[in-house]
Each structure stands twice: as C-alpha cells, then as structure tokens.
Design a protein with these regions (language model features):
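A nucleotide-sugar donor-handling region in carbohydrate enzymes
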Residues: 139-200
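Conserved nucleotide-sugar donor-binding subdomain of glycosyltransferases
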Residues: 75-118
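Nucleotide-activated donor-dependent transferases that construct or modify glycoconjugates
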Residues: 3-18, 106-109
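Charged helix-capping and loop-helix junction motifs
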Residues: 118-124, 151-155
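Short amphipathic alpha-helix
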Residues: 21-32
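Active-site proximal beta-strand in glycosyltransferases
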Residues: 104, 124-142
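Conserved nucleotide-sugar phosphate-binding/catalytic loop shared by glycosyltransferases and other
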Residues: 5-11, 31, 35-84, 90
Length: 200
C-alpha cells in the first residue's frame, strides 16, 4: 500500500512515571505501521536511547510528570507553569489536527485515568468537529485502578459510550477478565476487543 493512500492513526500517549504506557503504544504502532501512517503524540518525559522506527512519527509534547506520592502534575521544563505547559500542548494538538486528516484516534489508558481528562476530551471534541468520520479507540492494559463502581467509573463508561467506537483490552480474558478490576464492565456499550498481551 502506497504511503500516500494510507489512512492515518494518531495515538495519544501519556505517562507520568514509568514507561509502560509508551512501550505498549510503540509496539502497537509498529504492528500497525505497515498498513497505516502512525503518529504518536507523546506527553511523557522523552526516553533516552529509545529507537523509534522511521515509519513511525513521534511528536513530543512539552512533557509533564508527577510526584509518586501525590497527584501534582509538574512540567519537565521548570521555566513553565503547568497552565502554560498545557496551553503549549494544546497549540501543538490544534496544529496537528489542522494540518493532518486523522482517520483514527487511539487514546492510551484514557478514559480509565483522568489526570489529563481536559486535554484528551479537547482533542476528541476538536477531532470530531474537524472530521466527523474519524473513529475513536481506547487502548487499555489488563488491570486498571477502579473505584469499585463509583461515579468515577460511571464517568468512564459515559465517556466511552458517548465518544468511542472501540475498546481494546490488551489481555487474555481467560487469564484476566477486565471486569476483575473494572466492576462497571457491563455498562460499556461499545465494541470490545481483547487483543492478547502486548510484548516487545
């Protein structure tokens, strides 16, 4: 398939400590890159010596991490306030969506984590406005930090059912059913696909 005709997948990835989310996103991107043009939008700290295949485009947002003992978000660039950092990130997102016709958006871990809810919802809503035919996919690992069926879990289901087309769960349901860690699983009304575990 000629690269000009390839559909374009944008993958939003954010990690605040550890790089598991990024590794999973990168491996999925590799598996898709033969048939799609894949762009990774990375909001975590840049990873030194990480080899990105030339067929995958990596866009580095101004990085944000957080202290392990709190939910305080901190820009990697100490000269930026957190608000300024988010504003710069938003400008980059807008620029990408205005320049590139995105066919599929994949969000890593969202909406099962809400630290970057405003940013991801902004991305989703703007993309829906620009391209109503865009498809939306949530990519999530086998276990999540659920709130035992609380209002937070209800909001996760509401966002999935309102904005998304597919939930990809990266596990084997015979080994680790998703409802083990997410009690509201039956409230998810969109298509669900167990992909098996993602490995390097």
């Amino acid at each position: 398939m000629n690269s000009v005709t390839k559909k374009i997948i944008l993958m939003h990835c954010q990690y605040v400590y550890g790089i598991g989310h990024f590794i999973r996103t990168l491996e999925i991107a590799k598996s898709l890159s033969s048939e799609y043009r894949v762009i990774i939008l990375n909001g975590g700290n840049p990873i030194e010596n990480m080899i990105i295949p030339p067929e995958i485009e990596l866009v580095q947002l101004p990085a944000i991490h957080k202290k392990e003992d709190s939910n305080q978000l901190i820009p990697l660039n100490c000269d930026l306030s957190i608000d300024d950092c988010f504003n710069l990130r938003r400008e980059i997102i807008v620029n990408i969506l205005q320049r590139i016709n995105i066919d599929v958006l994949v969000t890593e871990h969202f909406p099962f984590g809400f630290l970057f809810k405003e940013e991801v919802l902004f991305l989703i809503k703007l993309l829906k406005e620009i391209n109503p035919n865009c498809k939306f996919v949530s990519s999530v690992r086998d276990l999540v930090n659920s709130y035992d069926g609380s209002e937070t879990d209800e909001l996760t289901c509401e966002i999935l059912n309102s904005y998304y087309d597919l939930l990809m769960i990266h596990s084997d349901k015979n080994v680790m059913p998703f409802e083990t860690s997410f009690p509201k699983f039956k409230d998810i009304q969109i298509s669900i696909k167990y992909t098996g575990y993602v490995t390097r």
